[in-house]
Amino acid sequence: MIGFYDYTVWLTYLSLISATVGIFVTRCGPGYPNIGAAFLLLCGLCDAFDGIVARTKQGRTPQEKKFGIQIDSLTDLVAFGVLPVCIGDALYRSCANMSPNPEAQIMAGIPYPFFVTVFVIYVLAAMIRLAYFNVLAEESSEKGEAVKTYTGLPVTAAALIFPPFLLLRHLVGRDIAIFYYGVMLLVAALFVSRFNIRKPGLKGVLIMVGVGVLEFILILVVRYYGARVL
């Protein structure tokens, strides 16, 4: 078979599996955005450590390294580009199936093509961001330099941005689903904006993982013990 299958790529493959399952489960029936957010966090967890794990193998060939870069970007597009869109679609459909309330009426009054446009803009921005990062990473590799900063918001930030928004819906006691799509547009703009972010070290990664784990636990609590399922 073509490709590579040693332990250095397992987390990337697991992230893609999590994203794929999340996409289908999220869009089942009336829509389950909270479940989708849980899968999104799992993708973020895998992404946080896939590079660290890959670098533990000594003597990786240039082909193995390039393969790892390619599958990482392709997986990120599915996990942090497509899955948040599916969560947004599930959010729209779950609101449509709720009992009448002012927020649901607001959602119903907006033509669905508007939401599709938001989804397209978001995925396109994520793809452009990933492709641009690959170009810069390849140039740095040719010069023998390590990537120390990111240009634009990394797409993996989606794993920590969207789940808290779903939790916020419960904390405020009312449906603020419409703002999810505004956040998507803002994040899309940040993906392609020209500003630099320092690449986090191990300590920074562990802090983000801790935040993600907390979000994951809270989402499960809300999903199974909350007053209502969204």
Model features per residue range: what roles?
Residues M1-G51, L190-L230:
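Topogenic membrane-insertion module of multi-pass membrane proteins
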Residues M1-L16, R55-V78, L130-A157, S193-I207:
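Interhelical loop and helix-boundary elements at the membrane-water interface
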Residues V9-Y13, T56-L130:
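Multi-pass membrane catalytic core of lipid/isoprenoid biosynthesis enzymes
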Residues L11-I17, F39-L42, V78-G81, T117-L124, ...:
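Lipid-exposed faces of alpha-helical membrane segments in multi-pass integral membrane proteins
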Residues L16-V25, D50-A54, R93, P100-P102, ...:
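Hydrophobic alpha-helical transmembrane segments
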Residues V21-A37, P84-F119, F165-F179, V221-L230:
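Helix-coil boundary and interhelical linker segments in multi-pass alpha-helical membrane proteins
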Residues E138-L230:
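C-terminal membrane-associated helical module and adjoining short loops/tails
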